[in-house]
Amino acid sequence: MTQPSEIKRRDFLKYAGMALAASSLAGAAFAASGERVEQNKVFEKSFRASAPYRDPFNDVEFKVRITFPDGREQTYPGYWAGGDVFKFRFSSHELGEFSYVTLSSNPSDAGLHQQRGTFRVVRYEGDNALLKHGPIRVSADKRHFTHLDGTPFLWLGDTWWCGLAKRLRWPDEFKLMTKDRAEKGFNAIQFTVGLAPTGTYFDRKNENENGLPWDEAAQRINPAYFDAADLRVFHLVDSGLVPVVVPTWGFYILRMGTVNAKKLWQYVMARWGALPAVWCLAGEISMPYYTSATPAEDGPRQIAAWSEVLAHLREINCYGHMISAHPKFGTSARAEVENPALLDFDMIQSGHIFMQALPRALTLLRQSRSAAPAMPVLMDEVAYEGIAETNWEDAQRQLFWASVLSGSPGFTYGAHGITQFSSDEFPSNVQPQGLSWGEDTWQNAYQYRGSTQVGIGRKALAELEWWRMEPHPEWVLPAKSENMKAFTSYAAGVPGRLRVIYFSALSAMELTVLGLEPEVSYEAYFIVPSNGKRLPVGTVRGNREGVWSVTRTRKHDLVLVMVAT
């Protein structure tokens, strides 16, 4: 009879898409010479402790030292997998022969200490961009993202704060969502690891099939939670979607303490660091718990505690994955940590009512781009589609174009109903203080038109040299009033080579481009941002003042693309 643990292992092998190596002989050399794994895929090895431990998670530390083909060495954390089993995972973009030796804080444990083996990393031959080009990094100019091999990466994220919870069932519902997002053009998914912003502390509605990730009574990890989570997270990667890992919401730090928060991060690093992941320190770093009796004191305490954890995360970040932090309402990650230089890129949160959120988001974006140290800036939480029964697709496409044409290397979308994966069976749209932001379910929300239309925008930009573009607000007429400034038009490009301009429905009937170079001709076309349709314009040159204009024949928003000939 097949045992439940065997079912999970079989499914893990079926769905994860990893190169796994296993041995049933404790204390032997677990890896035989000649094992192979494709570049950027995960090599995993399992070991059994030969010594008894009352509390394996807290009583023993397990690591592995990897020797690269050029002889350099790097140590990586291993992890407790439950019972007496410990594992390590590893991946590399480099090709060649690697060797490893395991290290235990208990040197007398022959099952965990000084186990040796070799394996070979071979070229990946598939078409998954994350495996072909490698994990995501900050570009040399500190303004956009690239893959490890330098290929530009135009970020389009989606927000699944409760995406690992069992109310988004594995495999059918999770795979439905993943397929939908990949087809629409998304390439990153941000999610919490069970300790989500919805519900009370350690709320059981955020469990997966195996419970919560953290056993508060025992002060340790629940490895079985991560067994179920692995299926989902590896499937994201297999589908070309970057896992943006947010282990916990900010207010948990006062409940768990910094020591346990560091241990949680080290465990996440050990299990998912070999994936092309992005690390987000925590969600809404300084936001107090909803019903806290001491909110004024909690925020500064949370910033101090998470700043300590950030320094630790930077220290143990053995794969060099990008690190950011998700800020509370109305600010950026720079303001949520004591040393912003430890962040690789900035995230901003500007609120959820479009007419207020867009101007605030643009202000935060410009402030961060002008601050030191330089780093890319993402609108990471802004005016979720459908939240408060507002912010529909017209708002979403304007947020996208406002973001990318104002200097951001992408955009993170969100839809109310999806962020918490509320359903009729598992309603989760009411916060602990009693506030509801809307009634819709994820089964409806994933079909909101805004998710399609931001994907249309990303696909259109991906055909251009978007990573060379800089904001150029001087290329369009200024708004007639300060109130309209954030809502009319945005322009970016490369002088003399490329211009991309968004004209909203509030722009004038006469669409005008300024500052055209006298010696340059452009081939121009409009994009209808709601459906991607192209409307040819033809050859464009400025007049003696460098001005060109055309009377619009469509009152809806339009994107003008001008490519030098």
Where are these regions (language model features)?
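Secretory targeting signals
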Residues: 1-7
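N-terminal export signals
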Residues: 11-31
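Aromatic- and carboxylate-lined catalytic core of secreted/periplasmic carbohydrate-active enzymes
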Residues: 52, 384-387, 396-538, 553-564
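Active-site-adjacent substrate/metal-binding segments within catalytic domains
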Residues: 74-89, 129-246
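Extended acidic/polar, glycine-enriched regions
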Residues: 78-138
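The substrate-binding groove and active-site-proximal loops of carbohydrate-active enzymes
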Residues: 159-169, 211-224, 249-259, 282-302, ...
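Active-site neighborhood of glycoside hydrolase catalytic domains
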Residues: 258-376
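Catalytic-core region of carbohydrate-active enzymes that cleave or remodel glycosidic bonds
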Residues: 340-425
